[in-house]
Amino acid sequence: MNETEKEHLKKVYTAYYSQIDFTKDFCEQNIKHITNIQKQPTYCNTPLFKFDGKTTALVYTLYSVSQICTDLLEHIENEIVRLSEVSEVEND
């Protein structure tokens, strides 16, 4: 691999890591926010134990977003490990 290719690859990795960091922060903030909301005694002025349509939909939506973010964070961690392994191989 010549120097131009290495520089290009470095820029690609830098941009990719930047996007990973942004996504990771976004997911962590969503999970934190959802956790705080779920600690509240009511959603939309409706007791959590009274599962009307609005409350039930909100609870499931928050759970779904939280689960998506958790899954995405796991994928990001795996991708970081994979990229570091690829980087080590290329540096050898």
Positions of PLM-derived features:
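Sequence/structural signature of long amphipathic alpha-helices
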Residues: 1-92
